[in-house]
């Protein structure tokens, strides 16, 4: 049975208007912030800005924008690196982790998934996404499958970061975004190229396709969780998440489809109680950025007065009109100035305290960089920095924004990897899995993030192992050789391989390890037997002269017994 999905366009648009109204206060404040922090992100937050127009009217100092871009670039390059694999797939069942064939299959799947990410526009869109997350505290990224070049092939991924003014959303009972409205403008000509749209447009709109193809109209795309659908059907109308495009002007449903997973990764830096939109470092830095810009504006005004000051001119001391042009000549009445021509024109000193302004600006800039965590994420250029000092900086960084990384992992990275894995699995882009015990069929696959920051968060176990080895070395030096029996060296090696992200093909199968050890034991036993035989042969060689003399001695003894018998 196919479930008939009926959509009430009017109800959807009313829900969209309510959601947009709840977001309006955020839009107003975010627009005010972005004019000082990152003006280029302010487009479409509250109306569209004309293309090519000036955006830095209120910005007199770029310290806030510079600090935010450094944080965003650091997060993007560290968490989603195009040059270093930033995630690993592992089975949730620990028993499966001891099966090298299965682990190699998961590693192959992870490598193919990572290659698909690198072949897409993820790195480019992730950089924009982290900018929104840093300045605004909220970002949304659309994750779709790209069109395949040939039928039956996997087409790859396509990502798009949404501007803050393009969308509004709703949360489920667990605080995760599960419904998103995206508003965008398109032309009638572009809409006519989308299959099925022009047939559903009213007659007036179809006429504009022919007569005014460049005219734009608004479309709302909503993705929502379906409450009623047939899980046995695989068509678009029976997927967990519904999708529909609505022409708002005519209230016409242009297209209806679905997704197997929610296609948007909506991330919040942090949330205030009762709010669904995030707040980030930009909110914390904004008061200082606003003060810094105002102080920089006043400093420029004071500087202009110092460079080109107001002049005090003695009344009627200059004969004719005064000129301030280079190489200009002014006739001075000597009697009026007492033959001191400098008294005729004098600058008006403002008495501005420029040093106070410089000190205040430096203090504000330091606070702004602290708000954007530049002191923790950006490693200073220090060639003599030791590994211990670098590890210490990573630990401080982890403590300062560790909770934020947790939100990024859950709301962005895990959603991207999970959806990407599911899309490639459905498309047959992975090799067939190896056989596993029946009780583990259908086990869950977990994601382990492998970026430098993620490894820093797991480095405590590695440090504990290193400290144990130092202690064990000391015990061995003291003659306590039995201390080594307390630890499982094989399990320790596997733990270190997992913590450091060692490729699975470098870790041997337990059966293979047992075979190698058995062969070594047999070889050692054979070697021991050869050594014993050699020692025996050496002993036999030393006894040969004595054996050679044995017959002669025996003959002498026999003669002695014979003579004794004759005498009796």
Where are these regions (language model features)?
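An N-terminal domain-start capping segment
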Residues: 33-61, 130-131, 204-238, 330-350
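Long, contiguous amphipathic alpha-helices that act as assembly "spine/axial" helices in icosahedral shell
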Residues: 37-38, 53, 98-146, 277-313, ...
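Short, hydrophobic/amphipathic alpha-helical patches that form generic packing surfaces
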Residues: 32-39, 69-80, 286-302, 491-498, ...
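Structured, contiguous alpha/beta core segments that scaffold functional sites
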Residues: 3, 17, 21, 145-329
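Short, flexible segments with low predicted structural confidence
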Residues: 104-105, 112, 263, 339-340, ...
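C-terminal anchoring/interaction modules
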Residues: 1-29, 42, 48, 312-568
């Amino acid at each position: 049975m196919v479930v008939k999905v009926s959509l009430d366009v009017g109800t959807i648009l009313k829900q969209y208007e309510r959601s947009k109204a709840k977001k309006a206060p955020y839009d107003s404040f975010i627009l005010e912030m972005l004019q000082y922090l990152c003006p280029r992100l302010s487009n479409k937050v509250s109306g569209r800005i004309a293309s090519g127009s000036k955006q830095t009217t209120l910005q007199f100092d770029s310290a806030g924008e510079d600090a935010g871009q450094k944080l965003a670039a650091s997060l993007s390059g560290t968490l989603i690196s195009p040059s270093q694999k930033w995630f690993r797939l592992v089975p949730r069942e620990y028993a499966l982790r001891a099966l090298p064939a299965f682990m190699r299959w998961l590693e192959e799947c992870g490598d193919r998934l990572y290659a698909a990410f690198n072949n897409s526009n993820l790195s480019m869109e992730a950089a924009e996404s982290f900018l929104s997350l840093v300045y605004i505290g909220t970002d949304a990224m659309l994750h779709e499958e790209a069109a395949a070049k040939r039928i039956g092939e996997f087409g790859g991924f396509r990502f798009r970061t949404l501007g803050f003014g393009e969308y509004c959303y709703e949360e489920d009972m667990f605080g995760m975004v599960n419904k998103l409205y995206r508003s965008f403008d398109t032309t009638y000509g572009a809409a006519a190229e989308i299959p099925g749209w022009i047939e559903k447009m009213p007659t007036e709109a179809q006429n504009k396709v022919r007569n005014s193809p460049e005219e734009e109209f608004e479309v709302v795309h909503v993705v929502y969780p379906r409450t009623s659908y047939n899980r046995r059907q695989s068509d678009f109308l029976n997927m967990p998440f519904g999708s529909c495009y609505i022409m708002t002007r005519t209230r016409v449903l242009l297209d209806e489809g679905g997704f197997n997973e929610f296609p948007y990764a909506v991330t919040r830096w942090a949330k205030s109680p009762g709010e669904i939109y995030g707040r980030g470092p930009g909110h914390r830095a904004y008061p200082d950025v606003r003060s810094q810009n105002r102080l920089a504006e006043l400093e420029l005004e004071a500087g202009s007065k110092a460079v080109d000051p107001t002049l005090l001119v003695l009344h009627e001391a200059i004969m004719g009109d005064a000129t301030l042009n280079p190489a200009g000549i002014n006739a001075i009445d000597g009697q009026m100035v007492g033959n001191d021509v400098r008294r005729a024109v004098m600058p008006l000193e403002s008495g501005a305290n420029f040093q106070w302004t410089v000190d205040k600006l430096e203090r504000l800039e330091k606070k702004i960089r602290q708000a954007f965590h530049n002191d923790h994420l950006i490693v200073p250029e220090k060639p003599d920095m030791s590994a211990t000092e670098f590890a210490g900086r990573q630990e401080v960084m982890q403590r300062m924004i560790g909770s934020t990384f947790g939100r990024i992992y859950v709301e962005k990275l895990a959603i991207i990897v999970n959806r990407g894995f599911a899309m490639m699995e459905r498309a047959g882009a992975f090799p067939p899995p190896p056989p596993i015990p029946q009780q583990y069929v259908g086990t869950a696959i977990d994601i382990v993030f492998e970026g430098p920051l993620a490894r820093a968060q797991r480095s405590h176990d590695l440090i504990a192992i290193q400290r144990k080895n130092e202690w064990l070395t000391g015990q061995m030096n003291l003659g306590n050789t039995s201390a080594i029996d307390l630890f499982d060296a094989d399990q320790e090696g596997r733990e270190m391989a997992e913590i450091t992200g060692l490729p699975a093909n470098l870790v041997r199968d337990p059966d293979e390890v047992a075979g190698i050890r058995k062969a070594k034991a047999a070889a050692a036993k054979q070697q021991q037997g050869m050594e014993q035989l050699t020692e025996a042969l050496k002993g036999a060689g030393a006894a040969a002269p004595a054996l050679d003399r044995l017959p002669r001695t025996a003959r002498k003894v026999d003669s002695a017994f014979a003579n004794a018998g004759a005498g009796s």
